[in-house]
């Protein structure tokens, strides 16, 4: 698959087949992704790859805390979007599509809660990649570089027939990740990537998102 086709094909997969993803395939993906650019070749990323019993324990731990009413405590602060902004509207538009595909009425709190829990379970993917960085690098310094390696992981996964979903809900309770995945306190947990073979019969995987026309977000200077 060429690069342009991969970029256009990539989408967030929220439903997966139970088939396991081999360590060998995941290792190949990370080998390629590690070629992503970073400031002065600092490579400020670390990967914790989860599967099997450990991933199941993390799912259960996340859901137990969520159901208990425990407040999320992410180490990478996730901020919302201004209510009247175009950014918030884009998010709302996507949520409407997903809820329609999943047959979740706006007023059905039980179904909405069930959908929310999927994110805390890494969308039931057979594997997940946790991205972390060294705490000595500060809050925002390495984020651009980590964004580059995330995109590269997602694009490379397509070569192996895999789907991905970049998500933060799975990292909302870092103490659960540290307990089962043994991520040291010296590392700041940034984000997760659910990864596996897409279940194309899962309704949410049929969602199609739009992109703002380039003319609306680009200023050309010095061109005829």
Language-model region placement:
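Acidic, surface-exposed loops and disordered segments
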Residues: 1-224
